Amino acid sequence: MRKKVIAGNWKMNKTLEEGLSLASEVANMAKDEVPADVNLVMCIPYISLAAVSKVINDKVAIGAQNVYQKESGAFTGEISAPMLKSVGVKYVIIGHSERREYFGETNQQLADKVTISLANGLTPLFCCGETLAQREAGIHINFVNAQLTESLFHLSPEDFKKVVIAYEPIWAIGTGVTASDEQAQEMHAKIREHLASKYGAAVADEISILYGGSMKPDNAKGLLACKDIDGGLIGGASLKSRDFIDIAKSY
């Protein structure tokens, strides 16, 4: 049975005080409202990780939004996997489309980040996805497959099974274009098919694949009903406790 995962990505939002308030609200609501088989994750700014980890309960796990690919050293401004682990982090987003676009992160860099995260007991939330131009050119499936191959396929089957994948249809995020349930399911099925080509159908069927294309309370139920969509990587809606919890109740 694949894990159901609803992960919130706060991005660069919320001061420490605001973050503590939101995290407390989510944790308290989750305790009473979210089904036991749904894994809730909040991926929050570095400055709030240690403090928030102390105010949540066992219904919510803490995630980071990035990690550096080395254990330690002279890398000013970076945060390592051992540091994240030391403050209670369980998950880490790797390869978000914004990191790829604004910071030029490459598939090889992301492969290194995945490796070091797993070595330190963190669960990678690995992001992949295509732009509108790539989709319209008909190369979107090959493009996403290449992201997966170059960043994940060096892993052993045992390590690979610890990864959670998030599909981000970049063309449907903040563009006014909406991905239908059918389009989302098609890409998730193609991703699982590609995973099976490397690791076999049994392993591929264990991997949770989240949808990261503007999931909200009003579209979550349809998306989460799709055969190959196991959860969501939530952006804006994760900044409102009620919306985030309502999405988690949509299975």
Curated annotation (Swiss-Prot):
Q: Which domain of life is it from?
A: Bacteria
Q: Which residues form the active site?
A: 96 (electrophile), 168 (proton acceptor)
NCBIfam families in alphabetical order: tim
GO cellular component, alphabetical, reads: cytosol
Keywords, comma-separated and alphabetical: Cytoplasm, Gluconeogenesis, Glycolysis, Isomerase
What name does the UniProt record give this protein? Triosephosphate isomerase
| Listed GO biological process terms | gluconeogenesis; glyceraldehyde-3-phosphate biosynthetic process; glycerol catabolic process; glycolytic process
Residues involved in substrate binding: 9-11, 174, 214, 235-236
Location comes to:
Cytoplasm
**Keyword rRNA-binding, does the record have it?**
no
Pfam families xrefs: TIM
Pathway annotation: Carbohydrate biosynthesis; gluconeogenesis; Carbohydrate degradation; glycolysis; D-glyceraldehyde 3-phosphate from glycerone phosphate: step 1/1
> What's its EC?
5.3.1.1
Q: Which reaction is this enzyme known to catalyze?
A: D-glyceraldehyde 3-phosphate = dihydroxyacetone phosphate
Q: Could you say which protein family the record assigns here?
A: Belongs to the triosephosphate isomerase family.
> What Gene Ontology molecular function terms does this protein carry?
triose-phosphate isomerase activity
- Coiled-coil stretches noted in the UniProt entry, renumbered to this chain: none
UniProt enzyme class: isomerase
Report the source organism: Cytophaga hutchinsonii (strain ATCC 33406 / DSM 1761 / CIP 103989 / NBRC 15051 / NCIMB 9469 / D465)
* PROSITE patterns assigned to the protein according to its UniProt record, in alphabetical order: TIM_1, TIM_2
Q: What does this protein do?
A: Involved in the gluconeogenesis. Catalyzes stereospecifically the conversion of dihydroxyacetone phosphate (DHAP) to D-glyceraldehyde-3-phosphate (G3P).
Subunit relationships = Homodimer.
